[in-house]
Structure formats: structure tokens, C-alpha cells
Amino acid sequence: DQQTGSRTFVNFDREYWLPERYLEGGRPEIVKPEATWVTVWKSRKLEIGLFLLWLTAAGTVYALRDKLVRRSTMKDTRWKDYPKYFLWITSIGFVGFYLLAVPSITQVLTWFHSILFEWKWELFLSDPFIFLFWIFIIVSVFFWGRGMFCGWMCPYGSLSELVYHVAGKLGLKRYQRHLLPQHWHDRLKWVKYGVFAGLLAVSFYSMGLAEKLSEVEPFKTTFLVGVWNRSWPFVTFWSVLLAASVFFERPFCKYLCPLGAALAVPSTFRWWGLKRKKECGPCAACAVGCG
């Protein structure tokens, strides 16, 4: 500073080579190792291509779902059922068990902290499937809301839905309920928002503790570690959720899932919601039940 005479020092990194005339034998060849995430992406080109095809197919089917429903009849529901079953099965087998590409609330918490404190692209690019999945989820949430991911593409949600449908086909349909009794449903549906808010608050105290508490999601037990590799508390919790899925449609998704609660926030700003038809009355029951 010319006025005060104080000095300010700045540190920075920059490559520097001496001129070749000062080096015996010329400048040496330096092979720089490529970033780890680049190596991972290159090594899984085929799976990435298949995953992108799956995402494209899912987006196309969901965009055309109204046309598929119109082509279906009460006796022939193949047009609306088969694409949905295909996405459920591939979500469980290919995306969940094979690619291990299971979006989780921990990734949402990491995203929050990265925005507030330090953003590192390498962290998000380290898993190509999770990275691509989240780009697709964010875009689809603002187009159609969380319904596409939660209802058609989530590996655990698909597993829970298939368990419910298979149980119905095996003769348990008369014992099944779409929802808990209405007075219970109206209260319990808010629990997942409390779980999400609690995990987000805890993460600012201790991210490690938040990650442990986030195992309220059974995703890790189901796909990443395997239920046979967990201790009895995890096995018990997982088994209770599975048993509940036999009799109630997606109980975890409706009442406990913090990821669904997190996605509900941007879903408020979706471009396309439930469509009203000329036959619609003023009851708005569909918006309350599915919106």
C-alpha cells in the first residue's frame, strides 16, 4: 500500500518450466494422472449409455402417460400397466441392485452443505449414475413434480409397490388398503417432513450423526449393503416395512421418506400438475390424494 507502506502477500500455484536451453536433454515428459472421476466415467461407458437410455425411456413414457391411459380399457390395461411394470422392475434390478444408483437424503444434505460452505465438483462427479440421476430428477421435478421419480423410478418405492401388487395377486387383496384410516393418514403424512427437517438440522451440528440417522431410509440395507449383512435392528426395521408393504401401498413413501419430503418443496413449482377435465367437479379430491 503506497499510503501506509504495508505489504500484502498472495499465494498462488502455477506451473513453471525453465527454458529448454537450461535443461540437459530437453524438457522431460511429465504424465499427469487424470482425475479419479474421469477414470470412473471412462471405465463405465456401456453402463452409462444404458442408464441414459433408461432415463430417456422413462421420461418418454411418463410424458405420454395420458395417451397410454386413453388407449387402455377396463378389461385391457396393458397400455398403462406394462410400461409402469417395466420401469419398476428395471429400477429395482438394473438401477438399484446392479448400478447401486439409489438417490438418498444424504445426497440432498451434502448438496445443502456444498452450497453453503464449499462446492467440489469432484464429489458429485465421483458416481456417474447418481450424478446423472439427480440431474434428471431435478428437471423432472420442475416439469411434473416428484410423482415421476417417487412413483415410477425410485428403486425402493418400486420394490414396495411390486410387493403390494404381488401380494394382491396371491390372494391378499381383500386385506389390503391403499391408505391407513383417513384420520391416521391425515396426521402421519406429515411425519416425513419432520424427519427431513430434523435430519437437515442435525447435519449442521454433525454430518456424521445425520448420516447415521438417515438410515431411517431402508435403501442402504436393501441395495447397497444387503439385509443379510446388517445387524438385527436394521433387519427388524426393514422387515417391518416389507410386511407393511404387503397390506398398505407404499407405507414408507407416504409416511416416513425424507427424500420424498425434500422433493415436495420444488414440486410446488412444477409446470404441469393434475389436469382438470370437463367432467371434473369442485371436490378437488384428486389434488388432495395425489397432488
Task: Name each model-derived stretch.
Residues 1-289:
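Non-ligating segments of multi-cofactor redox enzymes
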